[in-house]
Amino acid sequence: MASLESSMEAHLQLYEIFLTAAKPMALQAAVLLNIPDIIGSENQLSMEEIASHISASTNKPVHIDYLSRIMRLLASIGVFTEENTVDNRGIPQLKYGPTGLSKLLANNEAQQSCAPTLLFLNQNIMAQAYQFLHDTVIDGSQAFTKANGMNLFEYNSKNPEANRIFNEAMTAQTSSVMASVLKAYGGFKSFKSVVDVGGGAGSAISTIVNEYPHIHGINFDLPHVVRTAAPAKGVQHVEGNMFEKIPSADAVFMKRILHDWDDEHCLKILKNSYDAIPEDGKILIVDAVIDKEKGTKRQVGLMSDLLMMAGCIGGKERTEEEFKDLFHKAGFKSYSIIEIPFYHALIEVSK
């Protein structure tokens, strides 16, 4: 009997893994239906009230049964609260309210929504790439390219909508991460110029310059990316290729860039960064450093590592030892790791 119970528990654990995709897809449905905003930060709403808001915004009827099943799952994983109440006629009903998770998916001025990141990761082009992970193991091929006929960056350059979704996701991630970076690192005050390599729309370097107005900020990225970047006070948008040359500055800043590439490409980026800074300059890297201790932070890092494996050319999340080896090969003498919340770290690298 004990072995049967153990076997069935194992089956249950496997099925939880098998069906995990239902969670982000239900979350996406809620975001596209604007439910985090409908519920907001304080409201406790019945299914009928939520449905009424959706119907008003879409001008279409809502199938409440289907909606309730989505909400039931999301409440079970902590995205919304679920409370048994009675209406003014004494009839039992469920009411749904906000949590810290749902607030992070709503649009508000206080913080950047995480919804764009969800929509980016849930795209068909990303899901299809995972179908080829086994080929990556056998022949070293790039899963995203096999699935979509070109790598992610080429795809974005040829598809404006995909490029928009990607840039919105990167901007969303930047807002929360940069707040932690600025709180943890005071070294920016000693720099007169900072170049953000792979800076996208320029949100990270704009955040730095807003906090330290004396800094001349350079947002450096590929031409098709820089073309969509809005003008920003104190920031110069420069197009180019980080594998060829990086603009000179007192500090080179890179947020979630090295994890896109294999060691060979990372060495080119780091060596070009070395050439771009003076002897007392710094390289500032914001990236995941895979945690040694078991827990959510390590698991998220490992899942992100698999995302890099599927989505990028040799992309990977790295351990501290792997970063140390790259820095040594690129000619740098020392580095220090500054812990910040989430699963990222800030790495300061010196000549």
Segments predicted by a language model, with ranges:
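Short beta-strand "wing" residues that participate in macromolecule-binding interfaces
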Residues: 81-82, 98, 285, 334-337
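A short glycine-rich, Lys/Arg-flanked "PGG" loop and its adjoining helix->strand segment in the class I
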Residues: 267-279
